[in-house]
Amino acid sequence: MPRALGATLVSTPLARRALRDRVASVRGARSIARAMSDAQDAFTSDVPPEGYTRADQVKRFAEAKAANRARVMDIDAVYDGSHVAGKRVLVTGANRGIGLALCRELAARGAVIVATCRSASEELKALKPAEIIEGVDVTSTACCDKMAKAVSAPLDVVINNAGYFYEPVERLTDGTMEFDEEMKMIDICAVGPLRVTNALYHAGKITKGAKIAMVTSQGGSVTWRTVQNPRGGDYGHHMSKAAANMGAKLLAQELKHEGIMVQVLHPGFNKTDMTAKYAKIWEIEGAVDASVGAKRVVHEIGLMTPEYNGMFINCEDGLQIPW
């Protein structure tokens, strides 16, 4: 386009308006970007927004310890598990770890337990749950459908707890990426809870008034990666938990119209076989026995109401975690 002609076009009212709109759009986009950056900084700072927990787990625990915060340091000081007495509660991944600890706590509180797993451990059998459903592979739709049909009656609470954690640290720069393991974690941790929930819903085992607890992890917070994973890595674990969180949020949005509540729960840092590779930081990050983690989860389920539907909660302190 000749220079003179271009100048003439820009000088017309329509062209000037278009140019102003474009400049305003660019400025608006930059303002939004700055606001998003500021929000990111707020959620990862030492003083997060009200109602949200702190990103730095070492500082979070040290602060709670110094202030002797009962919710964090002694769950029994605030714990009330009476709400599960007589309630039908299904737990996936019930044979070990936090799942087994949940079953122990639920049994102690008089819940009617429906325990699902691939293969029942002797410890689980000793609890004598009302129902043990074995052979449950959450990566199989057919297995989940079969499990749902085997559940004898509608449930009051579903705890989607089954998970998988590939222990070696993955780093692209080290050549240690394991893509098959990443897909396995995503299938079990993110798609698995959807298969279970879908099967139970369509079998009539999840109905109005039911609560669904999605046990995921703070590792699924995209916002917190700059603090908790400054060097990146551990792709499969974090991607699977972030995907699980998204699935749970979408479930919460859909099922609220059915009168069913869904909440995303980080159970806290628990001393289990799955976290054994982090044993050297258990103490400085406030890791607890699985029995304590189980109480934290049960306590939070008791606080679940429509007002808090779809929230991402840290069971250590009851505060929110940013997505």
What are these regions (language model features)?
Residues M1-R88, P322-W323:
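Non-catalytic terminal and boundary segments that flank Rossmann-like NAD(P)-dependent oxidoreductase
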Residues N95, G99-E105:
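N-terminal Rossmann NAD(P)H-binding glycine-rich loop of SDR-like oxidoreductase domains
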Residues R88-V91, V158-I159:
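Conserved hydrophobic beta-strands of the Rossmann-like cofactor-binding core
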Residues Y164-I186, V191-R195, Y201-H257:
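Catalytic loop of short-chain dehydrogenase/reductase
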